[in-house]
């Protein structure tokens, strides 16, 4: 969601450091989360920004936009509302610590900054992982932290399939019906 909102802010030529203008823009925007073909999507004023969520310009500015406290309030409420309406898996940097702190199944998926940068490069993306990690962990509003009851999975040496298998294994151990 934060990437979608960042894209929207940039599309409207709003300076990502102008908190007041960002808030004004978002408070008048219609942000919808829905499911289509069993896939979640975000629409902002009826536009689906999915193809732009990993654009370099979004990568460069997402931490600036997402650290605005009112932006976080708006989006956290949207995510909580969506979770109340649907059974779902939600991923994000503060899902287990801020958005859904009471969920019984929390995983903190991580990898070394070097591996994450390599993965992004293979996907054709440029992202300053270490810079973004520092910005996200030091922001005042919802800083990046590992929830105290989250299970940490270091994926540095794992394939996507192995990560999925590990999550399923841990869910089964917790009694989740799979």
Question: What do the PLM-derived regions correspond to, one by one?
Answer:
Residues 176-178:
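ATP-dependent carboxylate-amine ligase
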Residues 166-174:
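C-terminal alpha-helix
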Residues 92-93, 111:
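A short beta-strand-to-loop transition that corresponds to the Sensor-1 phosphate-sensing loop
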Residues 111-122:
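Conserved AAA+ ATPase core "coupling" helix
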Residues 48, 108, 152-154:
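Structural signal for conserved beta-strand scaffold positions within catalytic alpha/beta enzyme cores
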Residues 34, 79-86, 93-103, 122-167:
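Small-molecule kinase domains that catalyze NTP-dependent phosphoryl transfer to phosphate-bearing small molecules
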Residues 2-86, 99, 114, 126-131, ...:
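ATP-dependent small-molecule kinase phosphotransfer cores
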């Amino acid at each position: 969601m934060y990437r979608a909102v960042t894209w929207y802010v940039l599309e409207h030529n709003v300076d990502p450091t102008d908190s007041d203008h960002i808030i004004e823009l978002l408070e008048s925007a219609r942000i919808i989360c829905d499911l289509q073909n069993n896939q979640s999507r975000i629409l902002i004023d009826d536009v689906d920004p999915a193809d732009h969520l990993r654009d370099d310009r979004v990568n460069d500015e997402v931490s600036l936009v997402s650290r605005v406290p009112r932006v976080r309030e708006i989006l956290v409420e949207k995510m909580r509302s969506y979770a109340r309406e649907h059974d779902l898996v939600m991923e994000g940097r503060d899902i287990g610590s801020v958005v859904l702190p009471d969920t019984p199944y929390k995983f903190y998926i991580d990898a070394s900054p070097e591996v994450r940068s390599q993965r992004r490069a293979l996907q054709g993306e440029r992202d300053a992982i270490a810079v973004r990690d520092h910005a996200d962990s030091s922001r005042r509003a919802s800083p990046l932290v590992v929830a105290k009851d989250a299970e940490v999975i270091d994926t540095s040496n794992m394939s996507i399939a192995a990560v999925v298998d590990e999550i399923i294994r841990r869910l089964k151990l917790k009694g989740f019906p799979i």
